[in-house]
């Protein structure tokens, strides 16, 4: 039974069509921003969810590692920004009422050097008011873990906003 599940995980991890890429980027962004909402309610503390089971057998670990290697192509800045815009996940309902727009900068997603098989992403979000002035910046870090082709965990860190002084 385990061999069948592993074979299915390997097969599903090999799909590289555009729908699959979009779905993976969407899963990544959705889980991350759900986490951001939790972090906002916990005074920006690091919030950890249950980690991937460390007792997986060697074959399963190889499968997961291969999948992580494949995931690098799924997590791109363009896909994340498109998903954020589609879902309005950085709209004013999550932040101060004077925020009317945002921009994402310094996006980077790489295989984690701290956790085998994980992907780490970092980026900054600058918040803009209705006068088109940049009023605050927040930096984000996230680590995502997968089991086969399904994201099973994510945890992150949100740093407090940095006010941007206005030149008058």
Where are these regions (language model features)?
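Sec-dependent signal peptide recognition
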Residues: 1-4
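C-terminal motif of bacterial Sec signal peptides marking the signal peptidase cleavage site
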Residues: 10-13
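A short linear-motif detector with a strong N-terminal bias
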Residues: 82-83, 98-102, 121-123, 131-133
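Bacterial signal peptide processing site
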Residues: 15-17
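Exposed beta-sheet edge and beta->alpha loop/turn motif
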Residues: 110-168
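Core segments of small alpha/beta cavity-forming domains
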Residues: 20-93
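A short, amphipathic edge element
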Residues: 92-112
């Amino acid at each position: 039974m385990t061999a069948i599940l592993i074979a299915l995980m390997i097969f599903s991890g090999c799909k590289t069509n555009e729908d699959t890429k979009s779905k993976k980027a969407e899963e990544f962004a959705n889980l991350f921003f759900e986490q951001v909402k939790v972090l906002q309610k916990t005074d920006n503390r690091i919030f950890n969810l249950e980690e991937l089971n460390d007792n997986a057998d060697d074959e399963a670990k190889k499968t997961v590692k291969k999948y992580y290697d494949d995931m690098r192509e799924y997590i791109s800045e363009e896909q994340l920004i498109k998903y954020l815009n589609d879902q309005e996940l950085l709209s004013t309902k999550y932040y101060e009422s004077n925020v009317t727009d945002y921009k994402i900068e310094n996006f980077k997603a790489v295989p984690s050097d701290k956790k085998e098989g994980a992907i780490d992403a970092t980026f900054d979000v600058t918040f803009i008011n209705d006068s088109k002035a940049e009023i605050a910046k927040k930096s984000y870090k996230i680590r995502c873990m997968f089991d086969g082709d399904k994201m099973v965990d994510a945890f992150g860190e949100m740093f407090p906003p940095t006010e941007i002084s206005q030149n008058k």
